[in-house]
Amino acid sequence: MEVEAVCGGAGEVEAQDSDPAPAFSKAPGSAGHYELPWVEKYRPVKLNEIVGNEDTVSRLEVFAREGNVPNIIIAGPPGTGKTTSILCLARALLGPALKDAMLELNASNDRGIDVVRNKIKMFAQQKVTLPKGRHKIIILDEADSMTDGAQQALRRTMEIYSKTTRFALACNASDKIIEPIQSRCAVLRYTKLTDAQILTRLMNVIEKERVPYTDDGLEAIIFTAQGDMRQALNNLQSTFSGFGFINSENVFKVCDEPHPLLVKEMIQHCVNANIDEAYKILAHLWHLGYSPEDIIGNIFRVCKTFQMAEYLKLEFIKEIGYTHMKIAEGVNSLLQMAGLLARLCQKTMAPVAS
């Protein structure tokens, strides 16, 4: 993956005008200073500042313009901007009344039926003066963590207070939301962010925070983020705070996952049918304490971009997939991983004449 400094454009971020607290900048690692997390400091405040998922965000912009918002469910992987999008929508709709007319709950903590009966119902009953056509908004983050009983109670509450209140649910998997709630909501789906989209935001933050970096450092951050903007910014800030410089070595010290260069070398040995050298690297990663899930995940991600014959790459990915399935089912021994390497080496060997 080649890293290009993609800056500006729709992905440009502005620091919030109403930051709850300033970020006091001192030398990285120095004690006695408070640093606002960059995830919060550079959180978008307007819908047009959100990176990625342009089609879905444009639908939210239509809701914000027209003011007639349905109940909505936003489903997608972590760190793609689901909660931020809902907050931006609420800010655009409610304006100065945001504090009084919005209730935000994290359903992974407040997940029981009592929360629906007490907090949500009491807020829905409150009278708030709003412009014509505007409604109070209740945001339920991690809504797929709610119990079935709480979701059934929420369904009834959504019906009773539909004239005054709108519900916005953010979740990772929409299939964990019961059908009656899904049928009452517009379901919007977010996908993982691309490397270029993450790079755009990283470059903007790097410029504002004056972070020294190398291209391989940015490549490492994007590799470890896996389409998650929150993780990318957290890894960037953690590496800068700990080392003051962004390069691949420092990033992998912070993220601590199997180094892709080692994994790449291991795959190269498999392509060369050198099982002994490949196993040495696997055993080294195993004894460093990495879980089989971490190792197999990185083998797959490195293999996708590895330069080899296309037919061979397809065979490799098929074997990696089978092994990943066995590991997920609980068969996660070193022997299982060694068997994968043996099968990969076998794919590259010329058949023995009988």
Swiss-Prot record:
UniProt keywords, alphabetically: Acetylation, ATP-binding, DNA replication, Nucleotide-binding, Nucleus, Phosphoprotein, Williams-Beuren syndrome
Residues with PTM N6-acetyllysine: 163, 304
Subcellular localization(s) per the UniProt record: Nucleus
Main localization (coarse): nucleus
Lineage: superkingdom: Eukaryota
Pfam families: AAA, Rep_fac_C
GO CC aspect terms: Ctf18 RFC-like complex; DNA replication factor C complex; nucleoplasm; nucleus
Implicated disorder: RFC2 is located in the Williams-Beuren syndrome (WBS) critical region. WBS results from a hemizygous deletion of several genes on chromosome 7q11.23, thought to arise as a consequence of unequal crossing over between highly homologous low-copy repeat sequences flanking the deleted region.
PANTHER family: REPLICATION FACTOR C / DNA POLYMERASE III GAMMA-TAU SUBUNIT, REPLICATION FACTOR C SUBUNIT 2
Subunit structure: Subunit of the RFC complex, an heteropentameric complex consisting of a large subunit RFC1 and four small subunits RFC2, RFC3, RFC4 and RFC5; the RFC complex interacts with PCNA. Forms an heterotetrameric complex with RFC3, RFC4 and RFC5; this complex has ATPase activity but is not stimulated by PCNA. The heterotetramer of subunits RFC2, RFC3, RFC4 and RFC5 interacts with RAD17. RFC2 also interacts with PRKAR1A; the complex may be involved in cell survival. Interacts with DDX11.
Function in brief: Subunit of the replication factor C (RFC) complex which acts during elongation of primed DNA templates by DNA polymerases delta and epsilon, and is necessary for ATP-dependent loading of proliferating cell nuclear antigen (PCNA) onto primed DNA. This subunit binds ATP.
Protein family per UniProt: Belongs to the activator 1 small subunits family.
Name recorded for this polypeptide: Replication factor C subunit 2
Lineage: Eukaryota, Metazoa, Chordata, Craniata, Vertebrata
